[in-house]
Amino acid sequence: MTMSQSVTTAVFERWVRNFAQLIADNREHLSELDAAIGDADHGSNMDRGMKAAVAALDESPPPNAGALLSKVGITLVSTVGGASGPLFGTMFIRMGGSLGTTDDTLAAGDVAAALRAGLGGVVDRGKPAPGDKTMYDALAPAVDALERSLADDGSLATALTAARDAARTGRDATTPMLARKGRASYLGERSIGHMDPGAASVALLIEAAADAAADAAADAAAEAADATP
């Protein structure tokens, strides 16, 4: 599969639901990370927001991927406190806006464009720079890796796996950083040695996307095999 690979709304929905489950599974860990440099509520806030987002999708299924991601973002802004709601919410809203009201099927390149737009939303909202010890430090390298892999004619599943690995590397790199944004920045040098919880959540987001793409690829392969005489 190349950049022309089709990506349906169902793949985006699976991504969101995967992310909600990963957040729920890691809720305590994320709050423990936040306890060291923040308010100790990042995990509970994100879990509440993603549960609300899934409930909103269940109540009124969006007609396309753009509307789906926008609904997730709007829900996060309205239900998640602190900086996480506006940042993750803006990211999803910008992603949805990038996809627009296109019909059910998109291309792999649209996924990369959506994540690039989401990164732009994070930059506009939070004004982070590389090395500030924020979600940017996991998201930016993930988007770069995704684009590079797709440019090399990789499948979406392969490209998102590369993005997942880059996000994890970026997440881990926040541990020795000095925080320069948000509540963690008030700690000064005491913020060094602690992983940024926002970056940890971004790594889960990209992991969820990689899993959704891999599942979709497996489903497509199975359907093709079944159709073979």
Residue spans for each PLM region:
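N-terminal loops that bind phosphate or other acidic moieties
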Residues: 1-229
